[in-house]
Amino acid sequence: MQKVAKFHKVSERQFLTDWCSATGSSTSEAKAVYEKIRLPRRATVGSAGYDFFAPETFSLVPRETILIPTGIRVEIKDGWVLQLYPRSGLGFKYSLQMDNTVGIIDSDYFNAKNEGHIFVKMTNQNRQGRNLSVA
């Protein structure tokens, strides 16, 4: 398998800025979250993609939207792109959706002003009144 990308954590400074802005958390709370960030990984040898993990577990009531600073940036070879999709089971069974349907991370985003920090915006579109958790 050809390696075209490598995942990294954003700097602690960048994460604290983004996390506190998105969640209203204190700096000390954000530092604790930063320490728990896990890099994306393949679940099995045959996995088609990498699993991303939310830095914290979130619960969403129906119709609620959340913006998640992942703490992750990705170094991608020129000419390649990272595509982000919601986990199929959460979308298919429970209507948890990414607000832009598919997240597109271009190879030059790694050098963006925010260090290429990847954010995910999700909405609980569940019509059965079910609260959903993201981990």
Model-derived regions: residue spans:
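Non-catalytic terminal segments and appended small domains
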Residues: M1-A135
